[in-house]
Amino acid sequence: MKIIRIVTSLFASLALMAGISSCSIYNNLVELDEQVSAQWAQVENQYQRRYDLIPNLVSTVKGAASHETELYTQVAEARAKAGGVIKIDENILQDEEKFAEFQKAQDSLGGALQRLLSVTENYPELKTNQNFLALQDELEGTENRISTERKRYNDIAQKFNSEIRKWPGVMFAGKMGLKAKPYFTAAAQASTAPAVQF
């Protein structure tokens, strides 16, 4: 009788420990998934900030460099394309193809802005325009924020992806419908060093 009680207590203790451990693993995965979503919202927030700055920047530059219409068209098209994918639902984090489309549109917009800013160097009157200088500083700060938020997103996505691939997280991830989150990568042109001429 005493042995049966000890064995029953032992199994009950093991079942309780397994239950507590399962709850802990489940809660950890939920928390990491929420952190990824929250960090993704910060990335979107900074892209939206850049998106909102562009019309003011373009209109300021247009005043001084009105004949650069092709460049303005490129910036407007890149902005429209980026705006079309900026508010994709959270499922973008589950679909690597949509994520790549989002990143490509944002990289294209960033490239168009860089071309716009490099063209402005040909117009000395812009260098004295306080509104332009303030917008340029704000855009530069926004680009830095985007870079920071992308890195933070990649960090938390890496932590999440590691947890759902390791045991015992892998057992829960499938049942919870959790998939690996995609990472931001460098733009294709970033792997080629720019040519510097003196």
Task: List the model feature ranges, each with a label.
Residues 2-198:
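A helix-centric hydrophobic-segment signal that preferentially recognizes long
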